[in-house]
Amino acid sequence: MYQTTAALRSAFLEFFRRNGHQVVDSSSLVPGNDPTLLFTNAGMNQFKDVFLGEDKRDYSRATTAQRCVRAGGKHNDLDNVGYTARHHTFFEMLGNFSFGDYFKQDAIRFAWTFLTEELKLPKERLCVTVYETDDEAFEIWNKEIGVAAENIIRIGDNKGAAYASDNFWQMGDTGPCGPCTEIFYDHGEHIWGGRPGTPEEDGDRFIEIWNIVFMQYNRQADGTMDPLPKPSVDTGMGIERIAAIMQGVHSNYEIDIFQSLIKKTAEILGVTDLENKSLRVVADHIRSCAFLVADGVMPSNEGRGYVLRRIIRRAVRHGNKLGATEAFFYKLVPTLIEVMGDAAKELVATQAIVEKALKAEEEQFARTLERGLGILDNALSQLEGKELDGETAFKLYDTYGFPVDLTADVCRERDITVDEAGFEAAMAEQRSRAQAAGQFDTDYNDSLKIDAETEFCGYSDLNGEAKVIGLYVDGQAVDALAEGDQGVVVLDSTPFYGESGGQCGDKGLLSAEGVEFEVKDTQKYGQAMGHIGLVKAGSIAMGQTLNAAVDKKLRHRTELNHSVTHLLHAALRQVLGTHVSQKGSLVEPERLRFDFSHFEAVKREELKQVEDLVNTQIRRNHELKAEVMDIDQAKEKGAMALFGEKYDSQVRVVTMGDFSIELCGGTHVGRTGDIGLFKITSEGGIAAGIRRIEAVTGAAAIAYVGEQQAQLEQAASLLKGDSASVVAKLKAQLDKTKQLEKELSQLKDKLAAATSADLAGEAQELAGVKVLVKLLEGVEAGALRGLQDELKQKLQSGIVVLGIAGDAKVNLIAGVTKDLTGKVKAGELVAMVAAQVGGKGGGRPDMAQAGGSEPEKLAGALDSVIPWLSERLA
């Protein structure tokens, strides 16, 4: 019964559905309602606002199978994954929840009934824990459920403070909290370990399978516990743990899901030992990585993207240990979809994107993995103690992209630790250098704290009167600004838009009779709007009334660019995939810049599709509608929110036909047709997993097209044709150039052969070895390698050193026939010469090249070759 994990999941959800619970889909691994949380790590995360009383649902009972990730931040299982039976980066949490509906009695009864009647677990294998003072829970277990008193274990404050207990749950220092009861399964006497509360409790015999939290108090800042008016229930049962019990195995890695992934990995890599811990690591990591990408996280160097990168790179390193010679990780996605069953709906929809992203990251890391591992191996082989220094760990991170936990993983296998404090110190030092390099003149107004509020009236008006409620110079409040002063003017209302959401602040003029204040920028300071600029005439005093006039032309051009970013965002998601999300933007009158998540360079044909799609929406002349609504209503309508932005309960939603709907507080055109034309000017990467598009609109786009046309016509003129024939003529010219280069190369080869024949005759004998040392003239640096090959063939057995002196530059090459590399290494020889001409170099024992910056010393350096060789050939 319920032998597969998929069947268990269905049975759990169906059991609670029959008992009046709403089956709610798993939320994203990226928490949408908690900026303090790196990843969704518990079933209750998506209901946090409900438990806090800040949100209401149309149901009071819910059940979920929630996808969770614990890697990075406070909840970090990464280091233990693969080495223990139950640590994972990704797991599914089965849960049932009551929002002021049932409480302890029903929660305990539901859990016991499901385990003992639905799953038919032997009651004698189960024991439970309760909080030490929770007599109510004890009585329910003992009197109503029938669990013997000796099988109900009271757990007190075992973590050094009041209510700090394994059996008392707290959301934070304040807020909802309460006691919990946990159900444990006894795997049998053949496994070491003791019951909860005993010295042997950390063993693997008794395993917690279900945690039932009773949220009945609201903890105040002073530590007092006030009863909640409507107590709630939050429960969680790890599906991997209960699957292990149902499938008669002890380790989670022995259940069906992991075994399928382990066997597939072994098949791809040709591994026969299925107990290899690296197989466990890979099988675990593909789950977290695939689902994170499916939920919109892309590998990068910060935040969630960096955690994903660390997990991928750890998996790739373990694949490398297993013998992987090419990208393999992404090939596990189809097997993952198969074994996850109904829980893989999001993965099915994004499979192609997930596979591409994982493959791209693996291939990128593979380019530095071997070299980085070589440096780490070398450092470890020279280690005298049992700790790797932080400097080396930082170099591996900084130069080769090795996350410190990956370095620690390699060290762990050799019983070596990493000086993490030293690593953090090196990291901090680099940050300090970067900050010092980036410091310019201080703008004291950046840190202004203004306790005032400005009403924004700039959606409908660009001109209006307002009262001065604040004046600031160099971050300090003043009573007045005189002519020539630079400062910040705060008004009680303004049509000026303060920079936010990527849109630049408005420019314009504040004026009164005899007074002019040129507004060069507008910034938000809390709820206040600061007009930054210069008093051109007169003076400004507190309480004075000014006319505020926005520069209409600049505002209009900015609006064109802002509106088109919405169209661009929607177009990118249509063409590239729904994993695309906005990561930043800059909207100015002259241009727009749009940063977005994507794992590879956007292809030329994809860029054209995006551009054409945006221009199609412009020509459709959609009316732009802006509405203020409840944030839940906006989400139901499908409005896109900017990742990382904090929104109020009431939000402004901007809609453009049926093509785009976003939360946005910025200013926009009336209709998409006002934009006129959209033209992409560049696309490129700015960080791993982050791409940037720059573009222009309206008159600027027309001017850009005109410039491109002028350049095309100029090229046509140079090629003696018209613009329609430029490509054909250019191709013909390139083909001709290629043929000429080929002929030139052949002539150079002939010349090198002739030169080598002449030079070979100049070789001298030294201790029975032919040696040729020559300062060449009239020979290009690119011909050196071929020339030394020819000379070695002519000499059959010998040593060649050639040098070329140019303008402030030296090129050197040394060649040693293979029969002599036991006595003389070309790399050592060329390095000796290069050191004398201000350079360095190296290479293989039979051929090595070098450069230098002091050509005047080359002749003397070459003279030192014979004495140097004499010592080694004697």
Swiss-Prot record:
It is found in: Cytoplasm. Zn(2+) binds at H562, H566, C664, H668. GO terms for biological process: alanyl-tRNA aminoacylation; negative regulation of DNA-templated transcription. Its EC number is 6.1.1.7. Its cofactor is Zn(2+). Its main location: cytoplasm. Binds 1 zinc ion per subunit. The keyword Ligase applies. Keywords: Aminoacyl-tRNA synthetase, ATP-binding, Cytoplasm, Ligase, Metal-binding, Nucleotide-binding, Protein biosynthesis, RNA-binding, tRNA-binding, Zinc. It is an enzyme of class 6 (ligase). InterPro entries: aa-tRNA-synth_II/BPL/LPL, Ala-tRNA-lgiase_IIc, Ala-tRNA-ligase_IIc_anticod-bd, Ala-tRNA-synth_IIc_core, Ala-tRNA-synth_IIc_N, Ala-tRNA_ligase, Ala_tRNA_ligase_euk/bac, DHHA1_dom. It catalyses: tRNA(Ala) + L-alanine + ATP = L-alanyl-tRNA(Ala) + AMP + diphosphate. One of its GO terms (cellular component) is cytosol. GO terms for molecular function: alanine-tRNA ligase activity; aminoacyl-tRNA deacylase activity; ATP binding; tRNA binding; zinc ion binding. Belongs to the class-II aminoacyl-tRNA synthetase family. Catalyzes the attachment of alanine to tRNA(Ala) in a two-step reaction: alanine is first activated by ATP to form Ala-AMP and then transferred to the acceptor end of tRNA(Ala). Also edits incorrectly charged Ser-tRNA(Ala) and Gly-tRNA(Ala) via its editing domain. Consists of three domains; the N-terminal catalytic domain, the editing domain and the C-terminal C-Ala domain. The editing domain removes incorrectly charged amino acids, while the C-Ala domain, along with tRNA(Ala), serves as a bridge to cooperatively bring together the editing and aminoacylation centers thus stimulating deacylation of misacylated tRNAs. HAMAP family: Ala_tRNA_synth_B (MF_00036_B). NCBIfam families: alaS. This is Alanine--tRNA ligase. It comes from Shewanella loihica (strain ATCC BAA-1088 / PV-4).
